């Protein structure tokens, strides 16, 4: 049984990440905060975003903490970017989820939040310049009983991920494809979809589907119109595309609905 030490890849993080709603009340220390902020710099640069780490603001989650929906939520990544910009919202999902996976490898828990926080209160504690908006947030902190969590092996954490929630099936994630098409798709596509199946969603219902086009050996991502999640669909698409890209191994996405993935 391998411990977590040798599991340093983003695909390892995908295999163990779960939505964490209960946290220990131990704060994120300055050293960890510094490391997270260092990891944020290139992400903000690449994504043209303004994602910020905010610590020790339990008031933002007062209602969710009081109702028991969350426990001890107090820190968050404020996902800030250009206002009214669908491409930027997708980039925010893609790059902020990279931070989520980085935090996962550090033993921290995370949860994407769109509804279960006081957004106006959250905005008070971060910089939102004119022309920018606070899209949504990611709760971050030490998972409840985090010493027990850290003592678990990679295999145990993978097993916990597998049984964490009912996920949509591979068929649902490739809804527009025929059985023959699924069968004929290359391994990199299947691995990409499997990684995307493990992606979180701001609204807890992934509205993204993938398809493979054998004619030019590309994949495409689509917003599932039946999911009725217009508001955060582009954010969720960015999250799912990052997972797909890591699972597929090599390649690059075009942005937006119907964007193509070219496998290298």
Whereabouts are the PLM-identified features?
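Acidic, surface-exposed loops and disordered segments
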Residues: 1-264
């Amino acid at each position: 049984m391998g411990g977590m030490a040798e599991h340093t890849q983003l695909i390892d993080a995908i295999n163990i990440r779960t939505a964490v709603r209960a946290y220990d009340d131990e704060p994120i220390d300055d050293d960890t905060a510094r490391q997270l902020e260092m990891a944020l710099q290139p992400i903000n640069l690449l994504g043209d975003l303004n994602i910020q780490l905010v610590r020790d603001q339990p008031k933002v989650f007062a209602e969710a903490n009081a109702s028991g929906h969350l426990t001890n939520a107090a820190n968050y990544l404020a996902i800030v970017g250009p206002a009214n910009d669908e491409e930027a919202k997708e980039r925010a999902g893609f790059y902020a989820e990279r931070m989520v996976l980085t935090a996962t490898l550090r033993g921290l828990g995370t949860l994407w939040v769109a509804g279960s926080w006081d957004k106006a209160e959250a905005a008070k504690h971060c910089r939102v310049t004119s022309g920018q908006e606070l899209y949504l947030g990611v709760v971050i902190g030490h998972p409840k009983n985090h010493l027990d969590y850290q003592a678990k092996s990679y295999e145990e954490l993978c097993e916990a991920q597998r049984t964490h929630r009912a996920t949509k099936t591979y068929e649902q994630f490739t809804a527009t494809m025929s059985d023959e098409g699924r069968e004929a798709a290359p391994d990199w596509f299947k691995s990409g979809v499997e990684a995307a199946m493990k992606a979180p969603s701001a609204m807890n219902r992934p509205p993204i589907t993938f398809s493979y086009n054998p004619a030019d050996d590309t994949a495409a991502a689509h917003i599932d119109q039946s999911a009725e999640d217009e508001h955060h669909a582009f954010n969720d698409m960015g999250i799912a595309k990052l997972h797909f890209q890591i699972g597929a191994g090599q390649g690059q996405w075009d942005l937006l609905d119907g964007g193509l993935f070219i496998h290298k």
